Amino acid sequence: MRDKVSGARRWVVKIGSALLTADGRGLDQAAMAVWVDQMVALRAAGVELVLVSSGAVAAGMSRLGWASRPKAVHELQAAAAVGQMGLIRAWESSFARCDQQTAQILVTHDDLSDRKRYLNARSTLRTLIDLGVVPVINENDTVVTDEIRFGDNDTLAALVANLVEADLLVILTDRDGMFDADPRHNPEANLISEARADDPALDAVAGGTGGALGRGGMQTKLRAARLAARSGAHTVIVGGRIEQVLSRLKAGERLGTLLAPECNRHAARKQWLAGHLQTRGTLTLDEGAVLALRQGNRSLLPVGVRAVQGAFRRGEMVVCVGPQGAEVARGLVNYSAAEAQRILGRPSDEIEKLLGYVDEPELIHRDNMILV
């Protein structure tokens, strides 16, 4: 299974607070530079990279002179606000040293649960990745409450992995991976090298919580791996203090714990789509479009659509039928019903002229479609 790591094209890398701070005394610039060198090397090897970075609250605590993590939400938000500026500036300057462009993205779980905002975030991230930019993502701790109390960037990283359809999620932690017993108390504990993410036996060995600076223990990392597995991504939980750990993972070394999904990314995506039983509208296709979908594994373009029915919004499930009304496919549509009415039967290069903007060149992308 390790070839799934070395051969992964799109990585989401999550780095925890403990790996970015100097024992609670602010950001460790030297450590961040080492991480950047490894990530730039991954980029040079053809890896598309998204970074999910913890550390804003920890950095803010240091700047404010707080020795322990506060419990009051408004104090946590203040620390996040103070620390986020230093955190993103540190990443930007370190990446700039290697001529690597970065982008800051602050999100909440709500941004990824609302379908329209989810699609907008996905489009932005895809564009940044296509441009060769490394997005640096953090949870917007300054404006949320429940996430600060109960959330964690492990979960956020898994949601981002689903969002960008990553092949691999790497969760870097202060432990070397998952063990069959707690290595802090049992010297006979063995590292679990590989397992299925859905293996129920893992629940018994994933006890424990995060440290003083972070908030995600091994249980949250296991939950994150299972969440990422829903879209077919593999997850490696690995020690961030292992020298050149990212480069060595890319080289195929068996480091950390590799948690595999039940099925590959493409199959997982199709299963997820098949589970959407409720449809919001119907697109009637011409014979050419039907043939392209059935034989060519193509996306559905506006030029092949003859009629639109229903009141659907962007991102909702619609049915595609042929000229005689027989169902051909169903999928997630990139434009609302009103927008689809205006562009049906027209080539994709006219979308911007007709609507004043263009989100995607296709009505339904083939990755968001299942044939019937």
UniProtKB/Swiss-Prot annotation:
An example GO BP is: L-proline biosynthetic process
- Per UniProt, residues of the PUA domain are 280-358
One GO term describing the cellular component:
cytosol
> Pfam families, from UniProt?
AA_kinase, PUA
| Pathway note | Amino-acid biosynthesis; L-proline biosynthesis; L-glutamate 5-semialdehyde from L-glutamate: step 1/2
Q: Name one GO molecular function term.
A: ATP binding
| UniProt cross-references to SUPFAM superfamilies, sorted A to Z | Carbamate kinase-like, PUA domain-like
Task: Please name the top-level EC class of this enzyme.
Answer: transferase
Segment forming the signal sequence: none
Q: Where does ATP bind?
A: K14, T173, D174
* Domain of life the protein comes from: Bacteria
Among InterPro entries, the record links this protein to: AceGlu_kinase-like_sf (IPR036393), Asp/Glu/Uridylate_kinase (IPR001048), G5K_ProB (IPR041739), Glu/AcGlu_kinase (IPR001057), Glu_5kinase (IPR011529), Glu_5kinase/COase_Synthase (IPR005715), Glutamate_5-kinase_CS (IPR019797), PUA (IPR002478)
Which keywords belong to this entry?
A: Amino-acid biosynthesis, ATP-binding, Cytoplasm, Kinase, Nucleotide-binding, Proline biosynthesis, Transferase
Locations listed in the record: Cytoplasm
- Which reaction(s) does the protein catalyse, per the Swiss-Prot or TrEMBL entry? L-glutamate + ATP = L-glutamyl 5-phosphate + ADP
Question: Which EC number(s) does the record attach to this protein?
Answer: 2.7.2.11
So where does substrate get bound? S54, D141, N153
Q: What does this protein do?
A: Catalyzes the transfer of a phosphate group to glutamate to form L-glutamate 5-phosphate.
Family, per entry:
Belongs to the glutamate 5-kinase family.
In Swiss-Prot or TrEMBL terms, this protein is called Glutamate 5-kinase
